[in-house]
Amino acid sequence: MALSIDDLLRRAVENKSSDLHLKVGNHPYLRVDGLLTPITDVPRITPEEMLSMAFSMMTNRQKQKFKETAELDMAYGVAGLGRFRVNVFQQRGNVGMVLRVIPTKIRTVEELNLPPVISKICEEQRGLVLVTGTTGSGKSTTLASMIDRINANRADHIITIEDPIEFLHRDKRSFINQREVEVDTANFSTALRAGLRQDPDVILVGEMRDLETISTALLAAETGHMVFSTLHTLDATETIQRIIAVFPPPEQKQIRLQLAATLKAVVSQRLVRRADDKGRVPAVEVMIATAYIKDCIINADKTRLIHDAIAAGTSQYGMQTFDQSLFDLYTKELITLDEALSRASNADEFKLRIQGIRSAADAAREEMASQMADFERFARK
């Protein structure tokens, strides 16, 4: 019997996998709870089977593009099963594929175990919010949850620009248009420029990949729109530095001012293994653009202080570092101590905190919190 991509995807969904990996000469592999596992009862894939499965998901235009570029991103749906994000590529002269399972249900902030401040960020009416992390860290899932929260609570016009469209949003209180790159529009920057003429309240840009897209996103946020996007950065400090570095040196001072004026929050996340072995849970760093943080963005010599400011802003602003997030997950018994220590930026300090021993970092955080409070009072005058 011919190997069917739909049957393999059904196996992926049944096994609660996040991804399906296909390679000529190998059994299919599933990524379950972060680990790759072969489906050994399925025969090794032949070149002909791989090409047939890949082409069965493509339109004629997509087939032509793949033949020309040997790379293709697309979305694929199976009735009664779900939607999948597909990347098709060439490796060692053969076709390879990775298919990401897109959950059919958009989960809430609470269901995703995201910190409560995320819900507050969704109440912002204008500005820029960035969700960052490595590939597979759950950025799209978090963004979908935030957009769905706005959709349920505000009568807004929401435009999403994605490559490809992943989560399908249905109109609730809001009116949503979803546009897919190379299907509904040429690219992110073109769609974003056009979107400014479509009376939007909220714009989701799937990824800020280039200078033009970043510039237009900043302009959109500056002119009174709420803009959400993603970057492949590890934390808030790297995110700020990455955006600034995209621009030529003569423009960077102005971009710092523009970014400080528009940025509302940076949410960076990593997935860590649950203590009950039932999947993974996000460890999340949250930076809120307070007056002190804005000053750190404007002044290049102070950008390095952003991490310390996040650590000091927990009680007043709801900010948190990755290590603070890990500590919270550990105290809630969602992750094990071994998992927390293996993921912590400073394992020694983490151990001291568990033991209730005050560290030099605690004193530094208190001093930073005092400086931030003084700065905020001065900024309000």
Indicate where each model-derived feature is located.
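Short, flexible helix-loop junctions that flank or precede catalytic/ligand sites
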Residues: M1-K381
